[in-house]
Regions:
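Active-site-adjacent structural elements that line small-molecule/cofactor binding pockets in enzymes
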Residues: 1-211
Length: 211
């Protein structure tokens, strides 16, 4: 984050870390007002985001933990006297096709989730091993079959379009979340699939959108 701030400000930057490093790097098109948002899971990442970043993306977080994450982020940002943007990203599940896509998306997220999250949904070590094995041999489509349907509602907004809209807005208001972000689709789905997702979401909220 420190290196990015220097680069965006147009400075010449040296950086060293465990996984990469560079010398005399510079961005000719740097913008000093560029906002830096982090994303991740677990208390260490949220603490880092609250202390150093301009915002944080809470992606596919167990919904019972949203309040605690937001509170931790706000407290850390307040301690450093900064404006802070909190973004929530997850799927809107209103059809059987959505449910299957959510199971695919969770197949590569759940195995690396914190132990407390696995305990909350009743996911065992055996489940973790089986899903990872399925991912290695058949990718998300194969692993999705091992993601139990009862796990899904803990991470997504699920129900009728009206219920999903009401739940999203009430959750954001209760937790103090600033923005909602649709999750990215696989590259193979193409631009039209992304446009369809945006249009459908706009319809759920009674809005108009040009894609």
């Amino acid at each position: 984050v420190g290196a990015l701030r220097g680069l965006y400000a147009g400075e010449e930057v040296d950086a060293d870390s465990e996984s990469f490093g560079f010398r005399a790097a510079r961005l000719e098109y740097g913008r000093a007002d560029m906002k830096i948002l982090l994303a991740g899971r677990g208390p260490r990442m949220t603490d880092l985001g609250g202390r150093l970043a301009d915002g944080f993306v809470l992606s596919w977080v167990h919904r019972d933990l949203l309040d605690d994450h937001v509170t931790s982020l706000r407290l850390a940002a307040k301690a450093h006297g900064r404006q802070f943007t909190i973004v929530w990203s997850t799927m809107l599940v209103t059809t059987d096709a959505d449910l299957w896509m959510a199971r695919e998306s969770l197949s590569f997220r759940l195995p690396d989730s914190p132990a407390v999250v696995k305990e909350m949904i009743g996911m065992t070590e055996g489940d973790t091993v089986a899903i990872r094995d399925a991912l290695r041999h058949g990718g998300p489509p194969a692993a999705a079959r091992l993601v139990r349907e009862e796990w899904v509602p803990h991470f997504v907004l699920m129900g009728s379009p009206e219920a999903v809209a009401d739940e999203m807005l009430s959750t954001m208001a209760r937790c103090g979340i600033d923005e909602f972000q649709l999750p990215s689709l696989p590259a193979a789905a193409g631009a039209e699939a992304a446009a369809t997702s945006i249009r459908r979401t706009a319809e759920i909220f009674g809005a108009e959108v040009a894609c």
